[in-house]
Amino acid sequence: KTLRVDYIFTGDARQQAIYLDELSQLPSWAGRQHHLSELPLEGNGQIIVKDLATKRCIYKTSFSSLFQEWLTTDEAKETAKGFENSFLLPYPKQPVEVEIVLYSPRREVMANYKHIVRPDDILIHKRGVSHVTPHRYMLQSGNEKECIDVAILAEGYTGKEMDLFYQDAQNACEDRKSVV
């Protein structure tokens, strides 16, 4: 399963904060299966998940956010804003401590936030099993342990143009297959 954690990054060029918005459970985990506690890439933010009882790191990932990019703009010197950010983590089997850290370009901590997630918490929303957005597989090369899915969104198409969208999406898949 997957734990979706929704945060709101807020602030301006002088001061930043992180707030927890919502937790959701999704039916399957399609992320990496090995080296979960190692950082695959350096970003300007990190999420660290630790077993609550042992404090051992069980998952770590990095990211770069639009909020941190926005902080470098002139607008951020004059006004504060909030940006929504969602992260997908392996669903914990035991209670965990989740820490999220935002870094400056000089790798100084700008903001951090810690919270505990208990897997049996009734406030964690179960999603992805009902009210699933209609979708079609245009090309399916294997299961999520072997392959990744690429989503093609119908942005810009009207409801009446869905047949055209699916035709264009199929053409894009065929073009991609010929490149591989």
Residue ranges and their predicted role:
Residues 123-180:
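Fold-level signature of zinc-dependent metallopeptidase catalytic domains
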Residues 1-124:
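Beta-strand-enriched, solvent-exposed domains that form extended recognition/catalytic surfaces
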